């Protein structure tokens, strides 16, 4: 009986761990003089990080379309998914992420980042 309860508990904990994802939400406010072609080029480089950095488990991008008008000029949004805090931390110091940061730095007016554990 005790072994059955222990097995069920371990199984539930393993399932819970699989469902947890660390989300790294990034918004860019590009400078006004940056062309859409340049933004597209930068986004392609950002997306390539998913193939270069094993810790990235998912990458999504999109444009703000909220009718509320509360985006404070942030239009380009990116959601990067990690399985662990350690994976996110490795991403932050990864040489390819550093190179991308150097590329995007001169063309953005501001950056907004929020990390959170996704739960259901």
Q: What kind of feature is each model-predicted range?
A:
Residues 77-120:
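Surface-exposed, polar helix/loop patches in the mature regions of secreted/periplasmic/lumenal proteins
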């Amino acid at each position: 009986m005790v072994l059955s309860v222990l097995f069920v508990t371990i199984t539930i904990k393993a399932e819970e761990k699989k469902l947890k994802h660390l989300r790294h939400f990034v918004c860019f406010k590009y400078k006004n003089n940056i062309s859409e072609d340049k933004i597209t080029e930068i986004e392609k480089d950002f997306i390539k990080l998913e193939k270069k950095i094993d810790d990235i488990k998912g990458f999504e991008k999109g444009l703000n379309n909220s009718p509320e008008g509360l985006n404070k000029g942030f239009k380009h949004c990116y959601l990067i998914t990690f399985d662990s805090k350690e994976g996110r931390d490795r991403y932050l110091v990864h040489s390819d992420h550093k190179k991308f940061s150097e590329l995007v730095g001169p063309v953005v007016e501001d950056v907004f980042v929020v990390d959170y554990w996704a739960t259901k």
